[in-house]
């Protein structure tokens, strides 16, 4: 499916946020963004509106549009919402997962592993660039596949918003060392293994342990900064 100009504008801002080029608290200029993206202001305005609805941006009357600032509480809240909703939806999804779903889940685990191997081959201390991008895409697809299998579209929307926040403001707080990404991959593999066995308690435990560890790793750099 061909992307609309609205989607192009949205993806453009998302990339700027994810790369850290646009930072929390920064004021945005729609005309400048539209020019840099090579589109008119209308689709850029729609993209900004969409990100405001997702809580990533906010507007101040007669002042402008700003990137939401995220501290420890906001990061913690996003992970806690994920843990509660994803756990409940995982139980719902367990009896509904299809062969296609399992194929997607396995593929995401394989892609995460391939990204880790690319990291090893490049002798990276911290996963960055294409390996990181591939790893994160596979990570979120794994979780979204489980959510969609539950059939609860509202839960999916809430979690996507939480993921967006973690993606924009957690990507650069995480130190994606080999240990970090290898453990995340292991969590996904164990969740998949429990799902195949239709073992709900085990699947939920692995999921909650995974989210708890991700929350810990995301908050650690914030706590270090605040301690100075």
Identify the residue ranges that each predicted region occupies:
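Solvent-exposed loop and edge beta-strand segments that line ligand/cofactor-binding
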Residues: 176-180
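Conserved amphipathic alpha-helical segments that form helical-bundle/coiled-coil interaction surfaces
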Residues: 73, 78, 99-171, 184-197, ...
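Short linear motifs at protein or domain termini
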Residues: 1-96, 219-228
């Amino acid at each position: 499916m061909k992307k609309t100009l609205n989607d192009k504008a949205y993806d453009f801002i998302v990339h700027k946020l994810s790369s850290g080029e646009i930072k929390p608290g920064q004021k945005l200029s729609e005309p400048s963004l539209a020019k840099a993206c090579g589109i008119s202001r209308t689709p850029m305005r729609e993209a900004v509106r969409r990100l405001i609805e997702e809580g990533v941006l906010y507007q101040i009357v007669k002042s402008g549009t700003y990137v939401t600032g995220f501290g420890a509480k906001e990061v913690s809240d996003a992970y806690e919402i994920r843990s509660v909703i994803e756990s409940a939806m995982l139980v719902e999804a367990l009896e509904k997962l299809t062969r296609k779903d399992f194929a997607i889940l396995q593929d995401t685990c394989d892609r995460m592993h391939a990204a880790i191997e690319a990291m090893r081959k490049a002798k990276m201390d911290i996963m960055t660039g294409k390996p990181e991008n591939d790893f994160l895409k596979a990570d979120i697809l794994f979780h979204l596949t489980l959510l969609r299998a539950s059939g609860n579209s509202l839960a999916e929307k809430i979690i996507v918003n939480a993921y967006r926040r973690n993606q924009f403001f957690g990507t650069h707080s995480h130190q994606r060392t080999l240990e970090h990404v290898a453990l995340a991959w292991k969590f996904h593999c164990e969740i998949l293994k429990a799902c195949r066995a239709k073992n709900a308690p085990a699947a939920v435990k692995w999921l909650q342990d995974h989210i708890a560890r991700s929350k810990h790793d995301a908050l650690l750099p914030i706590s270090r900064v605040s301690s100075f």
